């Protein structure tokens, strides 16, 4: 059957092409379940070359029907028979008269509609989100939880659902929101699922990218049991299984999932290769570190590919290097627009992101401020940027429309990517209804098959290596006898409190013990630097830095800040806390970076700025508030033991780190795409309520549009309007 497929595929480009023979081969492949996917692939390729099938349009249409690609039946053909129209009516989605299911979507929708638990493993292009929207469109489900891997994807999902179902459902996506409706959809990361206590009586929960439930296998063959995001996702799964009537797990192609059945949750596992686009893959086999050969190959690809192209790179630094090389080779399009000027002013004109954007090339990476991520993706999808250079953010569900994908590196940071992740990146090429055939260019060899295409869920497969902080926070019903025994053994001596581990599940038991030991060894003078309730005590930052260096050193070291000695770390902490604003801190850091570079440091300004953006978002905004919350509880305990009666409350310091120097709550607007710099200008202009949630803040900005539209710049206004969904008159 493969031979029939290859011959037909090859013939499509030939001069003596016979459309009848091609469609005859398609029919043969579609008639055999073993070769059905190959037949469907040929149909997609035929639609990409419609002009070659003008003599046999009816046969082509019938083959489209036979392949189950009903959306193409609706979109690509005008002369539809009554029977064709009946098929389209049968496969029409409940949320839109204009959207039609393909056969696999309909199958999954039918399983879920009948109340079954479903685990779906399918390619990126299959259209998994349309199934969720259709379930909502039926109107029979009242409360749903959608668990997504990133805040960026939560925001993208929120926008889609708000537009389609905002009149019927309250869309909850931020910790500040209170549920006030009988009909609600929670769109949250796993950490936010675990923070909320109002997630009860759920009709259906969905976990997107369910493979993230499994601990990663390292190159050495060992399993990384310390990934706190995997732990948090398993805790969320346990919580949701307990309060939900049904679940739907989705992700890219894997072979099997293990662990759910041991927990007593029957489910239907569907693994399908149902693609709505065809993919052509070319491999170059260049060595990993041979940048010269890679850049040469990339130049050839850029010359040959005129359509929208995503280039996957292992890091923002490499993405910046590649962008500058594309510009040097003449593949940039010099652009002058207000957004480029805004970025130059607010960040720096020499920053890789600014230089790329000025030349019609987009950069997209995790530490990039949300508003710039959204703007870049919007411009790319609108066809205004030919190239989009991404890091692993491409895997996290950024919604893009690209004809071509170039995989420049087979790594994510310093980690090698496996065939599983490689395939996930490839799935970003092509787009149903836009690009029939996607082209993939792999500059290195394709990774070999590995066992990572099986997903083992730690919650269901509990062993000697299952982290105690995971076990402490899951539902008691989900603990195995073996885990209960381990659990009792760890907590028998009361050195570490169970309640503390449950409350701070981000941290491993060894980290709790480490912190306890540090406090026990502190003299009164050092310990007193931790006892305060508003303004940090003298020498607090010195002691805090010492604790960070022991507990979570990577939060600084992976972002270019040495943790030993702690002087540089203390300077960063002090610089951030004492700055008047986010902008002031960034500008100061850029000035320092320029000074280092002039003194011969090998780091570039872009590396320094990208590291600081990561520090602000990941370290200051996320990790350090968690460390402070844990410290506060442990300090209170030790203060009592030491006979200290003073009040201990770190709320003010935590807010200083996580709020970007904005009033309480206002930073929530950054998540929906309003830059922090713009928010500072709005704070100077308007009176924000301290008690308002993100919905109320958004409404307040809509109500005050007459004020801010006269007082702040054009680009700031564009960001606000995009975030709030305000269309210009």
Curated annotation (Swiss-Prot):
The gene is abpB. Keywords: Antiviral defense, ATP-binding, Helicase, Hydrolase, Nucleotide-binding, Stress response. Gene3D superfamilies: P-loop containing nucleotide triphosphate hydrolases. Part of an antiviral system composed of AbpA and AbpB; when both are expressed from a plasmid they confer resistance to phages T2, T4, T7 and lambda but not RB32 or RB69. Resistance is temperature dependent, it can be seen at 30 degrees Celsius but not at 37 or 42 degrees Celsius. The system impairs phage but not bacterial DNA synthesis (shown for T4, T7 and lambda). Partially suppressed by mutations in T4 gene 41, a replicative helicase. Deletion or mutations in this gene were selected in directed evolution experiments for resistance to intense ionizing radiation (3000 Gy). Part of prophage CP4-57. Coiled coil: none annotated. GO terms for biological process: defense response to virus; response to ionizing radiation. The keyword Protein biosynthesis does not apply. This is Anti-bacteriophage protein B. InterPro entries: DEAD/DEAH_box_helicase_dom, Helicase_ATP-bd, Helicase_C-like, P-loop_NTPase, RNA-DNA_Helicase. Belongs to the helicase family. Residues 109-271 form the Helicase ATP-binding domain. ATP binds at residues 122-129. Changing residue 152 to D: 100-fold increased survival following 3000 Gy ionizing radiation. Residues 297-472 form the Helicase C-terminal domain.
């Amino acid at each position: 059957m493969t031979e029939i497929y290859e011959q037909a595929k090859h013939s499509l480009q030939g001069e003596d092409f016979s459309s009848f023979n091609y469609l005859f081969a398609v029919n043969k492949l579609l008639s055999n379940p073993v070769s059905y996917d190959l037949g469907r692939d040929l149909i997609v390729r035929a639609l990409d070359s419609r002009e070659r099938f003008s003599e046999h349009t009816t046969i082509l249409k019938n083959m489209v029907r036979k392949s189950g690609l009903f959306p193409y039946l609706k979109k690509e053909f005008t002369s539809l028979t009554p029977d064709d129209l009946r098929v389209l009516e049968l496969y029409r989605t409940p949320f839109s008269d204009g959207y039609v299911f393909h056969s696999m979507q309909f199958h999954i929708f039918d399983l879920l509609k009948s109340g079954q638990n479903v685990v779906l493993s399918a390619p990126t292009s299959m259209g998994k989100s349309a199934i969720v929207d259709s379930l909502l469109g039926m109107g029979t489900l009242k409360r749903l939880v959608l668990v997504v891997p990133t805040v960026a994807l939560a925001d993208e999902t929120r926008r889609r659902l708000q537009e389609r179902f905002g009149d019927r459902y309250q869309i909850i996506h931020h910790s500040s929101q209170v549920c006030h409706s009988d009909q609600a959809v929670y769109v949250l990361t796993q950490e936010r699922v675990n923070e909320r206590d109002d997630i009860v009586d759920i009709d259906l929960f969905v976990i997107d990218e369910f493979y993230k439930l499994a601990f990663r296998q390292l190159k050495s063959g060992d399993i990384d049991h310390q990934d706190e995001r995997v732990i948090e996702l398993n805790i969320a799964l346990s919580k949701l299984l307990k309060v939900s009537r049904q679940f739907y797990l989705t992700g890219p192609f894997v072979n099997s999932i293990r662990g759910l059945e041991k927990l007593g949750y029957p489910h239907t596992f569907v693994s399908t290769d149902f693609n709505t686009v065809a993919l052509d893959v070319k491999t170059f086999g260049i060595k990993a570190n041979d940048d010269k050969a890679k850049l040469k190959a990339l130049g050839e690809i850029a010359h040959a590919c005129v359509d929208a192209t995503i280039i996957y790179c292992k890091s923002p630094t490499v993405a910046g290097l590649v962008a500058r090389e594309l510009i040097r080779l003449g593949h940039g399009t010099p652009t002058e627009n207000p957004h480029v000027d805004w970025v130059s002013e607010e960040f720096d004109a020499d920053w890789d992101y600014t230089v790329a954007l000025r030349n019609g090339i987009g950069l997209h990476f995790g530490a990039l401020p949300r508003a710039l991520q959204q703007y870049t993706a919007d411009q790319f999808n609108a066809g205004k940027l030919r190239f989009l250079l991404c890091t692993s953010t491409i895997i996290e569900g950024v919604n893009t429309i690209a004809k071509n994908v170039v995989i420049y590196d087979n790594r994510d940071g310093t980690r090698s990517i496996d065939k599983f992740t490689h395939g996930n990146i490839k799935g970003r090429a092509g787009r149903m209804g836009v690009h029939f055939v996607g082209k993939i260019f792999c500059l290195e060899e394709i990774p070999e098959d590995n066992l990572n295409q099986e997903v083992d869920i730690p919650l269901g497969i509990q062993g000697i290596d299952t982290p105690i902080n995971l076990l402490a926070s899951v539902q008691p019903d989900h603990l195995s006898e073996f885990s209960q025994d381990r659990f009792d053994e760890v907590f028998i001596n009361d050195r570490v409190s169970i309640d503390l581990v449950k409350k701070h599940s981000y941290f491993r038991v060894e980290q709790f013990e480490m912190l306890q030991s540090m406090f026990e060894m502190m003299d009164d003078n050092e310990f007193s630097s931790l006892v305060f309730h508003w303004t940090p005590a003298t020498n607090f930052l010195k002691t805090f830095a010492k604790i960070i260096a022991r507990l979570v050193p990577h939060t600084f070291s992976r972002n270019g800040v040495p943790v030993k000695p702690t002087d540089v770390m203390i300077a960063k902490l002090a610089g951030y806390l004492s700055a008047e604003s986010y902008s002031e801190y960034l500008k100061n850091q850029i000035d320092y970076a320029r000074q280092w570079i002039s003194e011969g440091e090998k780091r570039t300004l872009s590396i320094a700025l990208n590291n600081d953006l990561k520090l602000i978002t990941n370290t200051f905004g996320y990790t350090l508030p968690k460390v402070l919350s844990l410290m506060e509880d442990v300090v209170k305990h030790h203060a009592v033991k030491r006979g200290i009666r003073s009040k201990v409350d770190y709320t003010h310091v935590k807010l200083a780190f996580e709020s970007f120097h904005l009033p309480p709550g206002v930073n929530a607007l950054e998540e929906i795409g309003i830059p922090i710099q713009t928010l500072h200008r709005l704070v100077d202009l308007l009176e924000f309520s301290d008690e308002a949630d993100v919905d109320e803040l958004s409404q307040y900005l809509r109500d005050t549009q007459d004020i801010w539209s006269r007082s702040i710049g054009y680009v700031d206004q564009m960001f606000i309007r995009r975030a709030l969904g305000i269309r210009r008159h």
